[in-house]
């Protein structure tokens, strides 16, 4: 259920058919999240009438390593019958000026075009707090990511072990 690029390791093929929501640090159960995501198209349609643009669903899964963030994303994709477009820092970051921003835009465009769940693994690599940026490209890549997030009509999932270093503006953009 996942599409990986650049020779990345394959994710496990077997996906759980149920999920123990007691392991989630949320008041929303796994089944409620699946139901909400299934209704996301009607949410986007209503929002389009108000704002004139589609709005997707943006989720941030955070916690220490090994707590099942990526596994829960895989579970959601299985329950929704959608494939995951998994992007890691090695797929996005470039040493060339402007190419990182272009890669971010391409990831969102591909997920939109193919109607896939877009999963950014270790998202702290993509949008660390701009106040701590030492170089201009650190700010511009975060700006590009934030702009793409707002315009993305699909399901976006970001995972991180380091929520405390994320840019405050990015945290405000997540629904869950």
Language model regions located:
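Interdomain "pre-motor" coupling segment immediately N-terminal to P-loop NTPase/helicase cores
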Residues: 1-21
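Structured alpha/beta or helical-core interaction and ligand-binding surfaces enriched in interleaved
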Residues: 24
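Walker A/P-loop NTP-binding motif of AAA+ ATPase domains
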Residues: 27-176
């Amino acid at each position: 259920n996942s599409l990986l690029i650049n020779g990345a390791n394959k994710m496990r093929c077997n996906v759980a058919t149920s999920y123990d929501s007691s392991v989630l640090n949320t008041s929303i159960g796994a089944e409620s999240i699946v139901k909400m995501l299934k209704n996301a198209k009607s949410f986007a349609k209503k929002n389009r009438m108000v704002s004139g643009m589609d709005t997707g669903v943006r989720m941030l899964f955070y916690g220490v390593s090994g707590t099942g963030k990526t596994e829960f994303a895989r579970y959601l994709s299985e329950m929704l019958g959608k494939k995951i477009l998994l992007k890691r820092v090695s797929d996005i970051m470039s040493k060339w000026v402007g190419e990182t921003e272009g890669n971010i835009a391409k990831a969102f465009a591909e997920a939109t075009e193919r109607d896939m769940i877009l999963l950014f693994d270790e998202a702290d690599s993509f949008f660390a707090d701009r106040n701590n940026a030492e170089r201009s490209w650190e700010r511009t890549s975060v700006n590009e990511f934030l702009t793409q997030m707002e315009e993305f009509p699909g399901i976006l999932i970001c995972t991180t072990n380091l929520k405390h270093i994320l840019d405050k503006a990015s945290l405000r953009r997540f629904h869950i």
